[in-house]
């Protein structure tokens, strides 16, 4: 980071990496003051035909994400070591800090209103023409995965809809 920019908005862990690597930089917001604890900045999106034709494949991805969350909660350091350099192009130290500020939480059902509210904000800022359609957020497959894997779900520490 050579100082050629005045401001940056970025996801974790890269936001923290910018902060660490540029002397004199400061955080204006980390999202918590805007959105509150437990907000999501990432979602799993799938086209309707995929959901209709291959729901088991989507459910397998959801279960894998829940399994990864559990692995992260049970042994954070090992999980981060597995992903640093391969998935996240940053230092282990930056990744640890990012994980502590925005931990993995797959069950985002209590954030439904948050998603719709953000689409209204995006429309007001001119980024999108239409707000999120009411049927765009569908928790059916997540709820099926939870029901089919109650033991796994029960072990998760972070859940927005317990």
Predicted regions mapped to residue ranges:
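Intrinsic-disorder/low-complexity, polar/charged segments
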Residues: 8-9, 108, 138
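Conserved C-terminal helix/tail region of periplasmic/extracytoplasmic solute-binding proteins
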Residues: 123-162
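Generic low-complexity, intrinsically disordered sequence content enriched
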Residues: 20, 81-84, 99, 145-146, ...
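Short loop/turn and capping residues at structural boundaries
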Residues: 11, 29, 96, 133-134
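Pocket-lining segment of extracytoplasmic ligand-binding domains
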Residues: 1-86
């Amino acid at each position: 980071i050579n100082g050629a920019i005045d401001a940056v908005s970025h996801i974790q862990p890269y936001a923290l990496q910018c902060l660490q690597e540029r002397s004199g930089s400061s955080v204006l917001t980390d999202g918590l003051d805007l959105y509150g604890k437990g907000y999501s900045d990432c979602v799993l999106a799938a086209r309707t035909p995929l959901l209709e034709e291959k729901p088991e494949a989507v459910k397998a991805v959801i279960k894998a994400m829940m399994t990864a969350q559990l692995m992260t909660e049970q042994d954070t350091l090992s999980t981060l070591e597995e992903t640093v350099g391969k998935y996240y192009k940053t230092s282990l130290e930056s990744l640890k800090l990012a994980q502590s500020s925005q931990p993995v939480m797959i069950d985002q059902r209590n954030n439904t209103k948050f998603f719709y509210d953000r689409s209204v904000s995006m429309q007001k800022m001119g980024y999108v023409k239409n707000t999120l359609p009411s049927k765009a957020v569908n928790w059916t497959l997540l709820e099926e995965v939870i029901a089919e894997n109650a033991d796994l779900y029960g072990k998760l520490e972070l859940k927005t809809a317990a």
